[in-house]
Swiss-Prot record:
Name of the protein this chain belongs to: Probable dual-specificity RNA methyltransferase RlmN
Pfam families in the record: Radical_SAM, RlmN_N
All copies of domain Radical SAM core, residue ranges: 97-326
More details: Reaction proceeds by a ping-pong mechanism involving intermediate methylation of a conserved cysteine residue.
Reactions this protein catalyses: adenosine(2503) in 23S rRNA + 2 reduced [2Fe-2S]-[ferredoxin] + 2 S-adenosyl-L-methionine = 2-methyladenosine(2503) in 23S rRNA + 5'-deoxyadenosine + L-methionine + 2 oxidized [2Fe-2S]-[ferredoxin] + S-adenosyl-L-homocysteine; adenosine(37) in tRNA + 2 reduced [2Fe-2S]-[ferredoxin] + 2 S-adenosyl-L-methionine = 2-methyladenosine(37) in tRNA + 5'-deoxyadenosine + L-methionine + 2 oxidized [2Fe-2S]-[ferredoxin] + S-adenosyl-L-homocysteine
SMART domains the UniProt entry points to: Elp3
SUPFAM superfamilies found in the cross-reference section: Radical SAM enzymes
Enzyme class: transferase
Any one GO cellular component localisation term in the record: cytoplasm
Cofactor: [4Fe-4S] cluster
Domain of life from the UniProt record: Bacteria
Function text: Specifically methylates position 2 of adenine 2503 in 23S rRNA and position 2 of adenine 37 in tRNAs.
PROSITE patterns attached to this UniProt entry: RADICAL_SAM (PS51918)
Amino acid sequence: MKNILDLKYEELVNEFQRIGLEKYRVDQVLNWIYKKKVFEFEKMTNLSKEHRKLLSEKFFIDLPKLLDMQISKIDKTTKFLWELRDGNTIESVALFHSGRVTACISTQVGCPVKCEFCATGQSGFVRNLTVGEIVSQILAIELNRKIKVGNVVYMGMGEPLLNFENVIDSIKMLNDKKMLNIGIRRITVSTVGIPEKIIALAESGLNVKLALSLHAVTDYKRDQIIPLNKKYSVEELIYSLRKYQEITGNRVTIEYILIREFNDYPEDAIRLVELLRGLSVYVNLIPINPVNPKFHRPNRWALERFKEILEKNGIECEIRKEKGTDIDAACGQLRRRKLR
């Protein structure tokens, strides 16, 4: 049996025709799933009983099981703990701002990158998520929170570009008008930096937004907090961004976590200006969230000083207003966990 949520539109048409069902039946089923949020074939009443039985024998619709839902008392940010079919768990987040809802979704169970400041990698890496497990997070968020997701960021658990094929297919399904119908420019892929995959993303023609988690401006410092940097240097990352912009023309968001007396010095800001020269970028400055006790948030004056140096050199930036910190739903705080 196949999970319908793993299949793109053309694949579903082929699968349905293989079992003797017309193409328009695909549209009917997708309307039930993606528009009406009905996930049992038996309840799809514009299909005959015979067709419902046939579909139940050949396919299943796999939504993650909700284990826990926490809602921030500060800003309504909602964190979801899901159990997958094999018993593994992942987390997703819904962010609320200016009448819009952004879903922050996971792409892996755990994470192999193991950034020092991130909770996800501390629980180890298990496996990549399937296409359906990525897409179903949006459906499950909408179902359980009674909301409509308008923006999606691949910024939850895992490194999206290390699950490249499934992420690409899931983006196509999010954007498909017969499925979730989310505008392509409302989808952002956030990566710690896999240069060849950044270029491949540009060459895919999908035209999604890209965010690079840079966090340090020298290999010496980045090696200390992002082990993967020992394989892909800062220079290689910046080169891949230049290639990305040559191909797409899109502005790139640079994520920069600020850690007190580590990467928050004026010389770090000046080096960042030099690195980004000639690129069209927007820089998010993120005071580190409490995960690793050896790292501390910078002083407010250090934050403002860093921001001022960037702005004086023509780089648009902001100090990110963190959401969901009271429920551990902010940047770097998602982890693989079980309910006690």
